[in-house]
């Protein structure tokens, strides 16, 4: 799942290396609120889910791990890839 998230993030913002662990994507300026909205659309399509608007919070997008946890809570399919 994390590899797929990194691929989506890299397509959205190719100028950043999302493979570095432990980064706060928001605080490092790697994604902003506009990116979060675009990311939600991509994640919904990729994982066959619908992320609830109340879950579009910076803490849910602060890291690849946080995004993965959000996907699991949202019922993401095929979470092992």
Predicted regions and their residues:
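Short, conserved alpha-helical segments within structured domains
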Residues: 1, 21, 60-63
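Thiotemplate assembly-line natural product biosynthesis machinery
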Residues: 1-18, 69-81
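Two-component histidine kinase catalytic core, primarily the HATPase_c
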Residues: 35
């Amino acid at each position: 799942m994390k590899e797929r998230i990194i691929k989506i993030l890299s397509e959205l913002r190719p100028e950043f290396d999302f493979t570095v662990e432990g980064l706060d994507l928001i605080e490092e300026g790697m994604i902003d609120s506009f990116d979060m909205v675009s990311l939600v659309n991509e994640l919904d399509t990729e994982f066959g889910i619908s992320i609830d608007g109340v879950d579009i919070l910076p803490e849910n997008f602060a890291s690849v791990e946080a995004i993965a946890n959000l996907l699991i809570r949202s019922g993401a399919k095929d979470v092992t890839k």
